[in-house]
Amino acid sequence: MAHKKGTGSTRNGRDSNSKRLGVKAYGGESVTAGSILIRQRGTSVLPGVNVGQGKDDTLFALTDGVVKFETIRRGLRNRKRINVATAAG
């Protein structure tokens, strides 16, 4: 017979690293071309004027300017769009 109690096993104990998603540049902030504006999974926020979209749905600035958010009506639900407004002239 065993003289020690056997140790149990568990099916827990795993966790993934955080992906640091979210808004990186807020409305009114000045950004340079190539700056990451939003890291996201899927298109929660749509790219607007002077904003590009990476293959992982990251939104980034195409030109220097100021970040502007807007809400647009698309179908039955409202969507957010992010633009980069350049300085005129």
UniProtKB/Swiss-Prot annotation:
UniProt KW keywords: Ribonucleoprotein, Ribosomal protein
Gene Ontology biological process terms from the UniProt entry: translation
Signal peptide: none
Pfam families, per database record: Ribosomal_L27
Any one GO CC term of the record: cytosolic large ribosomal subunit
PROSITE patterns: RIBOSOMAL_L27 (PS00831)
Transmembrane residue ranges: none
Location of the region described as Disordered in the Swiss-Prot/TrEMBL record: 1-24
InterPro entries the UniProt entry points to: Ribosomal_bL27 (IPR001684), Ribosomal_bL27_CS (IPR018261)
NCBIfam families: L27
HAMAP family, per the entry: Ribosomal_bL27
Protein name per the record: Large ribosomal subunit protein bL27
